[in-house]
Structure formats: structure tokens, C-alpha cells
């Protein structure tokens, strides 16, 4: 065969491959991230029919009762879950729920992928095979051959038990056992890069290749897999690409915080990627107040062009044409712990709608998709549409200024001062670090601002945020729509945001004045008294909003987070810090 013809054939093959890659349908997935250890979230997004109607191609099922916890391991050892035992009955009931979830998804015409923490194994299995699967520290280890053998058996039984399951979403690092009482587990990544490679190759062989099922391997882990380009490539370059193996990556370099960089691992390497986006922002109200983030996710947040200039990409729009772009995965509901709890998921629906519809057709602009949302939700009049658009864009500006800063340096650790339903104070934490206390971070920030003569300016920014929320409340009163419940919730949730950020502004003001007093020995008691009264009135109005409006979300609490159920807080936090200075104003001792 002439060399020129051979060259032409190779060129044709590459062209066809490129065309195939360009015409692949993107994954448009959704997940409800149920709170571990709590009743399942009541939401439309649990319904596969609803997901299908909204254009999703698949459901990530994450109730933390994992599909691989719903198998018996009888082939390995029938004593792991003996016949007639309560443990086996639990497994049987869990398996029936998995089957029902698979049937429901397929009946609706979408695929289903089970969220899977690895390592999670039966407690009895670990006790029986402890010496063969555990390391010197008592942790289950993938460095032990028996552990790998058991996981091969586990995957075999998993897909034999649930042959219609479309695939798995794999998480390492965090291991949630709250909903699996007869199982135990730990992080499998004990040897860095090589642990990931060993696990991914196992999953690729057993799931993608042998069974033609899909693996979404989440990079969310410890040690750099998620946020280090070098680490990510060190792992993925050792893995042969497979059409059923997709890497799943949050759009942020770290967790879903506004001041975090765009993820540098996106687009690099030789594997398909799907991008995770949180809609019910766990560190920013969870849908209790307006917080529209998809303009920032798709086009780039304002801070990426101001206080946090990006070295590389800064938005999904910039990477949508990458050969590795495989779709989007919305976390429509959930993330984090406890509240605030919402009964109206309007703001979650808005974020989920825009990211999923844009992901289906990335040639659309974010604003075009946003306009379609208004069409679908009965926001018809020009004045209402203008007010709603302005409100949503303003909410993104208000949130970063209220929770972090849009003007000044804000360290990546300080963002944890507020999370879930909690407001931290300026004390140093008094519980073990393993409980992930949120107290202590704000004191670090205040110290840095004080030393750099910026504390007053930062506090002024918080006071200015209240004016933005006043504008949002005004705009909410201009929005008319077909659904009266949603129209009412826009108004109530906007007032919620205004009052919460008033509490934050006045709480920060009190703590800042007190902080300066602690440093100098001189407390401006007159000003402290003024802001203490404002702070108390803020809380009174905030509580009245909830009492008078059934649709209002549950309220924030002036405590710092600690990872102890069921309350997830102790006594430290904003309330304790404010009360310290109240006593000083009253003339009492600290």
C-alpha cells in the first residue's frame, strides 16, 4: 500500500475520532447530598421523573446507604451476615431500596450511579480477616493483597446483585459511616499517588472493562489529588484511558468557597472529566437567602479579576471546548451538616437549572439560560424580569462581601469562621482539632487585619453589605410571578439575607471593637453599647421573621461548628464573643 495512502488513512482515523469526541453527549448528572445520619431530604430532585423532565441524563444516588453495603459477602464467608441475623435483615432491606431506586431511575429514562465511599466493609468481615487486611495501625490497607482480593469479590457480588446498576461514583478520603451501622472503613490512600493508581486500575479492570459499567472517580480526597495539577497528573498519567472511566472534579481549588481559586486540574491530562457544582451552597446559606452563583461559575466570579486574579482558567466558559470536558454534575441539594433547613427550594432550583441547561448546550450564554428559567417559572413582565436578574447578580456580590471580602485579603483558612448554620466568634478553639472546630479562624483574621491596619476597613465593608441587602429586599418586592409561593419566598428569603447580614455586620463590629480593646486596654464602651443594642435588635427581627413566616428557613445559630452530632456546636461562637464585651460594657469582669 502506498505510503501516501497509509498516511491519508491515519489522518482519516484521527479525524473521525475527533468528530466522535466532539459529538459525544455530555453527562448531565444531579445528586441530592443527604445529611449523614439524618432523615432523607424531602426534595423534587429525589424524583427521577423530575430529573428527566429537567434534562438530566443521570442520577447520583447518595443516601450514604451505599450499594456495596447492601451485599452479603456469602461467597467469601457466610458468617459475615449469618442467616436469620438482624444484620442480614438490614442488608436485605438496604438491597431492596437499591433495586427500587434503580428501577425508578430507569423507568424515568435516566441512568443511576451509586455514590460509593471506599473503604467500607462489614465489621464482621474486618474482624474475621483483620490480620490479612489491616496494617500495623489497624487500618484496612490496599497494600495487603487480601484487601484487593476482597474488593474484587465485592465488585463481583455488587454487580451480580444489581446487574442493572449503571455505575459507581467513587470517593476516597472522607468515609461516612453514619447510615451503615454494621460496617466500618477508612481512607484507602495510605501511599499517596500509588494508592490512587492501584485503586483506579482495580476499578477500571473490574467495572469499566470487565462489566462495561461506568466509574466516576472523584478527585476529592486528601493529599493533593483534587487541587494539585502535578499530583493529579502523577496519578492519571499512569492510568490507561477508558470511555467508561471519568474523573469528577469540583470547579474550585478546594471546597465550595467563593475566595478559592478555579481548579487547576481541570482540562489537563488525557482523561474525560465531569465538573461538580454545588447549588445549595453549604457555606453560604443553603438556599435560605438569595445566592445565585452560576454567572460566576460559568463566566468567572468577580474576585477572579480583582482580589484573586487567576493564573490560568477562571470559568467553565473558558474550558467548555476542551477535549476533556465531559459534562456537569449539579449538587442540587445538600452538602455540609445540619441547617439551615429550607422548605422552599427555589434558589436551589435556579442554580441547578442554569448549570444543567447550560451543560447540555454550552453554546448558550448564561444569561440566555437564565432567561429561559424566568420563562419556565412565570416571571413574565419586563419590570419583574429586570428586577429578578438584578437581584440575583447582586446576591453574589453581597454574599462574598458578607462572608469573606471582595476588597481585602482573606486567607483560605479564615473562610471556615462561618459554615452550615453557624456563626463563629473570635476566641481560640478549646476542643481537639480532630473535631474540625470553626472557632479560632476569625481571631486569626482579625489579628492579621489589626497588624496591617485594615481592621476598621474590613468592618466597614461588612456594614456596607447591609445596604446591598436592603437593595435586594427592594428588588424582591418588584418581582411578580405565576407561582405565588415562590414569589412570597423570594421576598421572605431576601429579608432573611438582610437580617442575617445585619447580625454579621454588627457582630463583627462589636468583636472588632472588643478585639482592639483587648490589645490596647481601652474599650469604647459608648460605641460598644450602641452596637450591642443594634445587634440585639437584629436578632429580635430575625427571630420574628421566622415566627411570622412559615416558609422562612430555619435560622443561623451564634455558635462555632464542631463535628459532634447531633447539635454540631458547643458554647463557643459569636454569642460568647459578644457576651464577653457586653460584660465589659456593664462593668463586669471578662
Describe the predicted segments one by one.
Residues 23-254, 258-259, 284-286, 332-360, ...:
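Aromatic-lined carbohydrate-binding surfaces of glycoside hydrolases
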Residues 1-5:
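Positively charged n-region of N-terminal signal peptides that target proteins for export
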Residues 321-564:
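C-terminal non-catalytic alpha-helical accessory regions
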Residues 46, 96, 100, 153, ...:
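Generic recognition of stable, solvent-exposed alpha-helical segments in well-folded globular domains
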Residues 6-18:
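Bacterial N-terminal signal peptides
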Residues 246-336, 444-463:
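Active-site core of glycosidic bond-cleaving carbohydrate-active enzymes
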Residues 566-590:
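Terminal, non-catalytic domain-edge segments
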Residues 141-144, 189-193, 302-306, 359-363, ...:
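Hydrophobic alpha-helical scaffolding
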